[in-house]
UniProtKB/Swiss-Prot annotation:
Its EC number is 4.2.1.11. It is found in: Cytoplasm; Secreted; Cell surface. The lineage of its organism: Bacteria, Bacillati, Mycoplasmatota, Mycoplasmoidales, Metamycoplasmataceae. Keywords: Cytoplasm, Glycolysis, Lyase, Magnesium, Metal-binding, Secreted. HAMAP family: Enolase. Its cofactor is Mg(2+). The gene is eno. It is an enzyme of class 4 (lyase). (2R)-2-phosphoglycerate binds at residues 167, 359, 388-389, 410. This is Enolase.
Length: 451
């Protein structure tokens, strides 16, 4: 048994310049692990609580009372004494001890950010002690599947100060033989998209996740540019065959749902400000109308996946969406399911989705995250490993995606070091796998959830 000898947390900054927590764990046998916790902008109401310094003695340390020194103190003064002396390889025991220490359903006492930082650092320390890559430690010797990247090349919604209400417009390079070739293809599409935007007079500033954030007149205009960029790069906008590049959308519909209707507030405001409101243009939808709108997009564009197409409270919207389009398209739950096993069970029973987005900080421990992934996969769903909009140089999710053979990873565009770090880690993992056996990249076949 290799004991944990030291646990230390500190306050650092994430990719948006907001405070976040970093945790270091040391073991008796010389193991060391360090983890940085991400943070979301558009969050589900049922997510585990990210503890900030609002109304505490640390409140004025940072802008908006967004410090995390309370969470840091909870690690150093409450969690550390309880896990020092425990075996670093007993991940589930340590995670369960922290859950019990907190004692609340959403980890609001100690903070999900405090608990997750320790949970991930413990796993990394154990892997380091064994001189083993993290993905090998978590997944064993079997995983060789590299994930298809979902690259968020056009940002909107809460991730950008532009006119788009849909949060993410992504490309998925499917028709390629290796992860590196897929990334090379995405690189060409990304830079050709920039060229086309500039040629058409659009700005090429980027949003939180490294994608471009132009002020388009419609979501369709964004999709048109994606199709043109794919073609300009010499690839096939579609799902199948050599050089196929598909499109994926994260609508993040909870952000434009007012409790009764779905309202494209940003597009509507931009249209009115420019005095370009078209009498036939529609900005407000009920659930059925929004479903029909998605149907029009799916018929016109090579969209293979839509995430959070309806608000987290609109279960009937999700059920109807999955029933109508789930055989041929990936219907992903994020805000709906928040990486929570109990909520996922409900989604499975209701057949509301055929895929779940996995975000470590939505649930707050590595063990609970793995439980959600395994339940989804056992139920015939895909599990898409995801970053958050507030990220760092931490690359845990790259290893996790390979460890669990998720087949898909969503970690931003080909811009901003906090996003590129994950892609670089995946390139290293692919090289490592090829040195021992052969890394697998299967493109369209990762969608085993589609009929």
């Amino acid at each position: 048994m290799s004991k944990i000898t030291k646990v230390f947390a500190r306050e650092i900054l994430d990719s948006r310049g907001n405070p976040t927590i970093q945790v270091d764990v040391y073991t008796l046998a010389g193991g060391f692990g360090s983890a940085i916790v991400p943070s979301g902008a558009s969050t589900g109401s049922r997510e585990a609580l990210e503890l900030r310094d609002t109304n505490t003695k640390y409140a004025d340390n940072w802008y908006g009372q967004k410090g995390v020194m309370t969470a840091v103190d909870n690690v150093n003064n409450i969690i550390a004494p309880e896990i020092i002396g425990l075996c670093c390889k007993n991940q589930r025991l340590i995670d369960q001890k922290m859950i019990e220490l907190d004692g609340t359903p959403n980890k609001e006492k100690l903070g999900a950010n405090a608990i997750l930082g320790v949970s991930l650092a413990v796993a990394k320390a154990a892997a380091n002690e064994l001189r083993m890559p993290l993905f090998r430690y978590l997944g064993g010797t079997n995983p060789t599947l590299m994930p298809v990247p979902m690259l968020n090349v056009i940002n909107g919604g809460e991730h950008a100060s532009n006119t788009l209400d849909f949060q993410e417009f992504m490309i998925m390079p499917l028709g390629f033989r290796t992860f590196k070739e897929a990334l090379q293809a995405a690189n060409k599409v990304f830079h050709n998209l920039a060229k086309l935007l500039k040629k058409s007079g659009f700005e090429t500033q980027v949003g939180d996740e490294g994608g471009f954030a132009p002020n388009f007149n419609s979501h369709e205009q964004a999709l048109d540019f994606l199709v043109d960029a794919i073609k300009e790069s010499g690839f096939n906008p579609g799902f199948k065959g050599e050089n196929a590049v598909a499109i994926a959308i994260d609508a993040a519909a909870s952000e434009f749902y007012n409790g009764q209707k779905y309202v494209f507030k940003k597009l509507k405001s931009a249209s009115l400000n420019k005095n370009q409101a078209d009498l036939d243009e529609k900005f407000e939808f009920n659930s059925e109308e929004l479903l029909n709108y998605y149907g029009q997009l799916l018929a016109k564009y090579p969209i293979i996946s839509i995430e959070d197409g309806f608000a987290e409270s609109d279960w009937q919207g999700f059920i109807a969406f999955n029933q109508k389009y789930g055989n041929n398209h990936q219907i992903v739950g994020d805000d709906l399911t928040v990486t929570n096993v109990e909520i996922l069970k409900k989604a499975i029973n209701l057949k509301a989705i055929n895929s779940i987005l996995i975000k470590l900080n939505q649930i707050g421990t590595l063990s609970e995250t793995l439980d959600a992934i395994h339940l989804a996969q056992k139920s015939g769903m895909t599990a898409v490993i995801s970053h958050r909009s507030g990220e760092s140089e931490d690359t845990t999710i790259a290893d996790l995606a390979v460890a669990v053979s998720s087949g898909q990873i969503k970690t931003g565009s080909l811009s901003r070091t906090d996003r590129i770090a994950k892609y670089n880690r995946l390139l290293v993992i692919e090289e490592y796998l090829n040195s021992y056996a052969k890394a697998d990249y299967i493109g369209r076949e990762v969608f085993y959830n589609l009929k």
